[in-house]
């Protein structure tokens, strides 16, 4: 993809408002795209209504605008793209790469061992559901062997999917699309060439590579930025009660976030109109730390 126009994206989920961690990820994603003369897309990953906060999607957009982000094209909402995910799943079913699963979470927990990201599915329904039961979820049939994600900041990330993850869900039993399928379908359909996101998602990258492979698609490049943690070392998130960022004094907060990412603006860059051009001109991944960053930073 080296000869293609760089196309990045930021894809927040409206399960809460933006916090310092999501802001730093948005900044890194944006600057990597703009510093390379590329495009930056915005996608709302709103596929899990029970977890979503009413009004959060609009608030996220207002916050990004207040901080001076400028995205290319219209905002894409996953909730309006079910047909694309259904078509992809049907292709995987037709090729034998996906199969129906009737197992409940309780049944899996009773027989499976722990892996890198939850229980490793034991393959109960790989050759068909037990008699009298109908599968409601769909899983990707994972091949044996190691998958390697080449990350521009974190280096090589190797994972044996069959051993460490197992056949993973594409469509949940409750009818909601799984992240691993939707994110691949969207990035491929939108022509995303490079993904810059938080390092907490590095563990899921080999699964996405497997979906790309099963669909016959080329995978994008990856770069996983350091996550921000609280004083207890927990990733900033809704679950750890990370406070939402305020749009007041956006320039000061942008300066702080740039410093977290290894880019300290000069003292005479005081406004958003001054900070963004400086950041685009001076952005370099070589200055971004790879490991987690604990707040507050001195």
UniProtKB/Swiss-Prot annotation:
Q: What is its EC number?
A: 6.1.1.-
Q: Which residues bind ATP?
A: 238
Q: Which cofactor does it need?
A: Zn(2+)
Q: Which GO terms describe its molecular function?
A: ATP binding; glutamate-tRNA ligase activity; zinc ion binding
- UniProt GO BP: glutamyl-tRNA aminoacylation; tRNA modification
Q: Which Gene3D superfamilies match?
A: HUPs (3.40.50.620)
**Could you say which residues bind Zn(2+) here?**
101, 103, 121, 125
Cellular component, GO annotation: cytosol
Cofactor: binding comment: Binds 1 zinc ion per subunit.
Positions of L-glutamate binding: 9-13, 45, 179, 197
Where on this chain is 'KMSKS' region (motif)?
Answer: 235-239
Intervals of motif 'HIGH' region: 12-22
Keywords of this protein's UniProt record, alphabetized? Aminoacyl-tRNA synthetase, ATP-binding, Ligase, Metal-binding, Nucleotide-binding, Zinc
Q: Name one Pfam family in it.
A: tRNA-synt_1c
The superkingdom of the source organism is: Bacteria
Biological role: Catalyzes the tRNA-independent activation of glutamate in presence of ATP and the subsequent transfer of glutamate onto a tRNA(Asp). Glutamate is transferred on the 2-amino-5-(4,5-dihydroxy-2-cyclopenten-1-yl) moiety of the queuosine in the wobble position of the QUC anticodon.
PANTHER family the UniProt entry points to: GLUTAMATE--TRNA LIGASE, GLUTAMYL-Q TRNA(ASP) SYNTHETASE
Q: Which family does it belong to?
A: Belongs to the class-I aminoacyl-tRNA synthetase family. GluQ subfamily.
Question: What is the name of this protein?
Answer: Glutamyl-Q tRNA(Asp) synthetase
């Amino acid at each position: 993809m080296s000869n293609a126009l760089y196309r990045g994206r930021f894809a927040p989920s409206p399960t809460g408002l933006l916090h310092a961690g999501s802001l730093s990820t948005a900044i890194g994603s944006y600057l990597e795209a703009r510093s390379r003369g590329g495009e930056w897309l915005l996608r709302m990953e709103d596929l899990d209504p029970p977890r979503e906060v009413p009004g959060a999607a609009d608030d996220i957009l207002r916050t990004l605008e207040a901080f001076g982000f400028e995205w290319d094209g219209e905002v894409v909402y996953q909730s309006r793209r079910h047909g694309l995910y259904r078509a992809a799943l049907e292709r995987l079913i037709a090729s034998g790469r996906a199969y129906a699963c009737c197992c409940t979470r309780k049944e899996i927990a009773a027989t499976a061992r722990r892996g890198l990201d939850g229980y490793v599915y034991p393959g109960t329904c790989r050759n068909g559901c037990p008699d009298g039961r109908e599968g409601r979820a769909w899983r990707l049939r994972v091949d044996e062997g190691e998958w390697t994600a080449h990350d521009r900041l974190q280096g090589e990330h190797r994972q044996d999917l069959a051993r460490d993850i197992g056949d993973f869900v594409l469509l949940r039993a409750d009818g909601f699309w799984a992240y691993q399928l939707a994110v691949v379908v969207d990035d491929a359909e939108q022509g995303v060439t490079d993904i810059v996101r938080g390092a907490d998602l590095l563990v899921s990258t080999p699964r996405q590579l497997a979906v790309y492979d099963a669909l016959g698609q080329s995978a994008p490049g990856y770069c996983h930025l350091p996550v921000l943690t609280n004083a207890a070392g927990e990733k900033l998130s809704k679950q750890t009660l990370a406070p939402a960022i305020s749009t007041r004094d956006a320039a000061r907060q942008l300066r702080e976030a740039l410093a977290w990412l290894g880019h300290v603006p000069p003292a005479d860059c005081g406004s958003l109109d001054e900070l963004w051009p400086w950041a685009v001109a001076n952005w370099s991944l070589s200055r971004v730390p790879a490991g987690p960053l604990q707040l507050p930073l001195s």
